[in-house]
Amino acid sequence: MDIDALSLNELKALRSKVDRAIVTYEERKKKEAFAELDEIARKMGYPLAEILTMVETKPRKTVAAKYANPANPSETWTGRGRKPKWVEAALASGKSLEDLTI
């Protein structure tokens, strides 16, 4: 297939077909992998679901708060993620993050 000779619409249609083929291929391979794992687990006398529950997930590390609301010290922020409304309000009123540091 000479893709250089294809029009833009033909190239887009081809890309769409390739994208679908990739998704289908990956799904098929995942199902095959699952079937193999299930067979191995059954040969050893265990249901795969039971074995999968043994997979350890790392506990999320808690991050210490860096900033506190001067008006309500129980409201804190680690400095990660979206700024809480009280931080945005403090910054809008002219305070800096250093003013909110714990």
From Swiss-Prot:
Keywords: Activator, Cytoplasm, DNA-binding, Transcription, Transcription regulation
InterPro entries: H-NS_C_dom, H-NS_C_dom_sf
Cellular component GO terms, alphabetical: cytosol; nucleoid; protein-DNA complex
Domain of life: Bacteria
DNA-binding region boundaries: 80-85
Known role: A dim-light trans-acting activator of Puf and Puh expression, that has no effect on the expression of the Puc operon. Responsible for regulating light-harvesting-I and reaction center structural gene expression differentially from that of light-harvesting-II expression in response to alterations in light. Proper light regulation of light-harvesting and reaction center polypeptide synthesis is an important physiological trait that enables cells to adapt to ever-changing environmental conditions of light intensity.
Family membership: Belongs to the histone-like protein H-NS family.
Protein name: Trans-acting regulatory protein HvrA
Organism in which the protein naturally occurs: Rhodobacter capsulatus
Lineage of the organism: Bacteria, Pseudomonadati, Pseudomonadota, Alphaproteobacteria, Rhodobacterales
Gene, per the UniProt record: hvrA
